Design a protein with these regions (language model features):
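A helix-centric hydrophobic-segment signal that preferentially recognizes long
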Residues: 2-182
Length: 182
């Protein structure tokens, strides 16, 4: 009888211990996915100064756009918390959209080979960033689901695991931008 009791306790401990390990593993997957998002955000931030310099040659009087990009880039690179990084990345995205829309007003710029190469690199980076955001959000969903269920919620409370924040698009990012060819 005693042996059964110990065996039952041992099995229960092992089964619930696996739940703790799963939460730890999922938290690490979230962190890994976030580092890939950061990697692509950094790639974008490194690419933009070259794009800005190319555009400046054609659109010197568009100082406001260049200031917006510089400020947004500085905010993104200086952000420390995940929430701040997400917010500044969305702000940076809006500034990049303004820069890209400038090319519509300057046909010579659109024809510039360096500008085209940089735009192709930016498009590739944006695609990779979209993929990494999706992977990050999927990892967050799995993790958050597990720490809200049983026995994950118990282990989350014991281990101090809290919910992770999704990478959400800024409100303006959901609207289709207007492009004018006048």
């Amino acid at each position: 009888m005693r042996m059964r009791k110990y065996a039952a306790i041992l099995i229960l401990a092992m089964a619930t211990g696996c739940g703790y390990n799963r939460i730890v593993s999922e938290e690490q997957q979230v962190e890994s996915a976030w580092s890939q998002v950061e990697n692509q955000l950094q790639r974008r931030a490194d690419l933009i100064p070259n794009l800005v310099e190319t555009v400046k040659g054609y659109a010197r009087h568009e100082k406001g756009v260049f200031d917006d990009i510089a400020n947004a880039r500085a905010a993104m690179l200086g952000a420390s918390s995940r929430a701040d990084k997400i917010q500044s990345a969305n702000q940076f995205e809006g500034a990049i959209s303004k820069l890209i829309s400038l090319s519509e007003a300057y046909p010579q710029l659109k024809a510039d080979a360096n500008f085209q190469r940089l735009m192709d690199e930016l498009a590739g980076t944006e695609n990779r960033l979209a993929v990494e955001r999706k992977r990050y959000n999927e990892a967050v969903q799995q993790y958050n689901t597990d720490i809200k269920g049983v026995p994950g919620a118990w282990w989350a409370k014991i281990g101090g695991f809290g919910p992770k924040e999704y990478f959400k698009a800024e409100g303006g990012a959901k609207a289709v931008p207007k492009v004018s060819f006048q």
